[in-house]
Amino acid sequence: MPEFLEDPSVLTKDKLKSELVANNVTLPAGEQRKDVYVQLYLQHLTARNRPPLPAGTNSKGPPDFSSDEEREPTPVLGSGAAAAGRSRAAVGRKATKKTDKPRQEDKDDLDVTELTNEDLLDQLVKYGVNPGPIVGTTRKLYEKKLLKLREQGTESRSSTPLPTISSSAENTRQNGSNDSDRYSDNEEGKKKEHKKVKSTRDIVPFSELGTTPSGGGFFQGISFPEISTRPPLGSTELQAAKKVHTSKGDLPREPLVATNLPGRGQLQKLASERNLFISCKSSHDRCLEKSSSSSSQPEHSAMLVSTAASPSLIKETTTGYYKDIVENICGREKSGIQPLCPERSHISDQSPLSSKRKALEESESSQLISPPLAQAIRDYVNSLLVQGGVGSLPGTSNSMPPLDVENIQKRIDQSKFQETEFLSPPRKVPRLSEKSVEERDSGSFVAFQNIPGSELMSSFAKTVVSHSLTTLGLEVAKQSQHDKIDASELSFPFHESILKVIEEEWQQVDRQLPSLACKYPVSSREATQILSVPKVDDEILGFISEATPLGGIQAASTESCNQQLDLALCRAYEAAASALQIATHTAFVAKAMQADISQAAQILSSDPSRTHQALGILSKTYDAASYICEAAFDEVKMAAHTMGNATVGRRYLWLKDCKINLASKNKLASTPFKGGTLFGGEVCKVIKKRGNKH
């Protein structure tokens, strides 16, 4: 029995026609494209290589091979959309009637090799897979994928599309090869693609999204030492310690306990015995600069109203937990920044709350907050009062030095507070000077000289970082002269939880990007224009299709490396786009927090009897700070994902001209990244194996 090629695309068009005629295969009328003859070859000749499977064994997938010498199919350029692939697969093929499809009860007994391309695509979609185009060079890969899914029995009946910003490659890699053609484009099916494909980047109605809060799911298994979760407003640290992390998710914060509101004379005692203000005091300098004069507050409020997102859009695109946070912020801006929360600021004296208040009052004498935290709260209150025009907290005039408002105002560019401030790009940071070529160690490693004086950390940034480190209890090395903090040591450390996130992303550098559309939604227009991976122009694809392909194994290996390089760059673009989503949402929330803290300071300084309003504002600011904290970890994850895919791209760039087989190249490219060197210790193993063969 003759052996037919598994990948007939390597044959010329005339050779394909002669092989089909020699084996009694009827050719279609007229001159057809090469893909049509490749498809006929696969259906009628390649299928003869495999003996028919006995009944009852269709659900078992083929054995997985891990040999380095196994020749892998070379992906071809194709459209990244599933519908475009569906239209191409139908070219030159007899249309399949609906009545020809197998019955529901017979689908489990079908041989995947007998399915048409369209039926195979439908089966993969039913199992929750979003495949690329199915052509001759990719069909075998998808057949194996379908067999594995049927064996696992994980068919997904869901018809709701995932709200992803762009397509990500499926984890169908074998010996390092995957469906890289999802990011490629072809000249076929361009006109039909937009009609057939329903964009997965459209805004998903809020009713179709889950309303269960995330509960800080990203923080499961991640904890900061010596930095405990701040308690709800009006509670002590010991009481809050009993409530944190008693389940997998974070418990919802309780409303404020009804108490007699203190006057100005009682404010010191209130600040020293209860944790009224949860936010770290690292933001008070920025808040002071934002509100250098109380008369400018209405202008800032109006600017914030004009730039904040509309709550109606957020209602349709955000899950319950994040919708509440962002809606509360936007609601305060729409009402002229009067952030009163009925369930928190207007407190009822119900029996459960009364019992908690009684327990709180009984424990005040023995469960006082620690002196460092009390001092931090006191300093923070002082900063708010100074900002509002009051000298300091009564009885604590010496607790902190007076703030130099003039110097702060000199550092502020007044043009930054115009209506275009929030949407304007940030100032560019000067590039660090590079060492000379002689001082570089090896490769593309770049070392940096000491930062010149003009590029040192600004006094404003130095103040914020130093203040944050002090609040978090992190020590910083100091110079002996002038008692100033050394700029080279003034930095935040890489905490073990952040390093853990980076390590997880680098362990599998080609993993699929998680969807962030529910937590950080954007409109479909912005997602298509900014966040989607750019498609290759049709003119460029036309030039590529006209080029004569070079023969030989080395040429095929180089072409595969080029496609994998393009795939890695597309993934890096997706990760960077996701980080952009997160940064955009974080900027809006942080801007609203500035206005909230500024208004709370004005309330405390002008009318202490309205302290409950300030507490309501700070309570919502706490929620916004939690949102920003979790968003920061998501942004770390996206940054690590971008670094991993950039590393994969560089690996294929260096490997494409190496004289090793394609399987070894793919294995080296997918090796877990550890930093330092591009490939790590895996290179020695491959070189030894290759040396033994020779």
UniProtKB/Swiss-Prot annotation:
GO terms for cellular component: chromatin; nuclear envelope; nucleus. It is found in: Nucleus; Chromosome. Residues 49-108 are annotated as: Linker. Residues 107-117 have a biased composition (Acidic residues). Residues 47-117, 150-209, 338-368 are annotated as: Disordered. Phosphorylated in a mitose-specific manner. Expressed in many tissues. Most abundant in adult thymus and fetal liver. Residues 78-93 have a biased composition (Low complexity). Residues 109-153 form the LEM domain. Residues 558-657 form a coiled coil. The modification Omega-N-methylarginine is found at residues 86, 88. Its main location: nucleus. The modification Phosphothreonine is found at residues 57, 74, 154, 160, 164. The keyword Nucleus applies. Residues 5-48 form the LEM-like domain. A motif (Nuclear localization signal) lies at residues 190-196. InterPro entries: LAP2alpha_C (IPR021623), LEM-like_dom (IPR013146), LEM/LEM-like_dom_sf (IPR011015), LEM_dom (IPR003887), LEM_domain (IPR051656). The N-terminal part contains two structurally independent, non-interacting domains: LEM-like (also called LAP2-N or LEM-D) and LEM (also called LAP2-C or LEM-B). LEM-like binds DNA while LEM interacts with BANF1. PANTHER family: LAMINA-ASSOCIATED POLYPEPTIDE 2, ISOFORM ALPHA (PTHR12019:SF24), LAMINA-ASSOCIATED POLYPEPTIDE THYMOPOIETIN (PTHR12019). This is Lamina-associated polypeptide 2, isoform alpha. It comes from Homo sapiens (Human).
